[in-house]
């Protein structure tokens, strides 16, 4: 089977332009998911390491990545990607006024590396039907005060 990303075409409205017709956009449609066990099996077929050993390493990798992010370290997974914690929140007038309680969100920034960039560069696409149709929300009439 040729490798391709499946997509469907879906209507989207611009919420700031009420009353205008929707425009149509591509939306990726997943074919399924790949678990750690699935990845271990795939990796086993490309090398001499047994599936259970690969799985054990992948599970340990989860723990090591989480611990490194908790320590404020940047996680570089070779040419695959880089992971780093970022923060956002409210500002203070002065540095002295700043308190940790002003931090409102913690996120993991994902930056794809060369391997993923190259994978995206060579994508093929196959159009499919919409998998999960989102029901159009009915607009409620404005209530007068």
Can you name each region flagged by the protein language model?
Residues 1-56, 63-145:
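Strongly charged
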């Amino acid at each position: 089977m040729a490798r391709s990303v499946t997509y469907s075409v879906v209507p989207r409205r611009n919420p700031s332009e009420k009353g205008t017709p929707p425009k149509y956009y591509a939306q990726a449609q997943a074919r399924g998911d790949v678990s750690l066990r699935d990845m271990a099996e795939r990796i086993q077929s490309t090398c001499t390491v047994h599936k259970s050993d690969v799985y054990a390493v992948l599970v340990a990798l989860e723990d090591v990545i989480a611990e490194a992010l908790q320590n404020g370290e940047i996680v570089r997974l070779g040419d695959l990607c880089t992971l780093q914690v970022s923060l956002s929140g409210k500002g203070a007038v002065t540095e002295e006024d700043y308190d940790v309680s002003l931090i409102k969100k913690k996120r993991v920034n994902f930056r794809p590396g060369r391997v993923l960039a190259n994978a995206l560069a060579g994508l093929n696409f196959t159009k499919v039907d919409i998998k999960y149709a989102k029901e159009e929300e009915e607009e409620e009439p404005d209530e007068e005060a």
